[in-house]
UniProtKB/Swiss-Prot annotation:
UniProt cross-references to HAMAP family, sorted A to Z: UPF0473
Source species of the chain: Clostridium botulinum (strain Hall / ATCC 3502 / NCTC 13319 / Type A)
Pfam families (alphabetical): DUF1292
Family: Belongs to the UPF0473 family.
Protein name in the entry: UPF0473 protein CBO2561/CLC_2432
Amino acid sequence: MDNNVDTITLTDEEGKETEFEVITKLDIEDKEYVVVVPKNEEVDEAIALRIDNNDNGEEVLVPVEEDEEFNMVAEAYELLFSEE
C-alpha cells in the first residue's frame, strides 16, 4: 500500500461502502498494518487492519482480531504518537 494514501474505501459483507481516513501505516515483524478511522462518523476508536496479499497477489486489508496481534499494533501506534 502506498504510504501517501489519505483515505480508503472499504466494502463490508453486505456491500455497504464506508470511507476511512488513514491515520498511519506501521511495519511490525515483517507485516504491514494501517490504522484507520471512519471519515464522516463521530467515532473515537481507530481500527487496525493488516495488509495481506490474496491468491492473485493483490493487497487486501484484513481486520486484526487476535488479541496478541492487536495489542502489538496498539503498542506500536501509541509509541509512535507519544513521541510527537
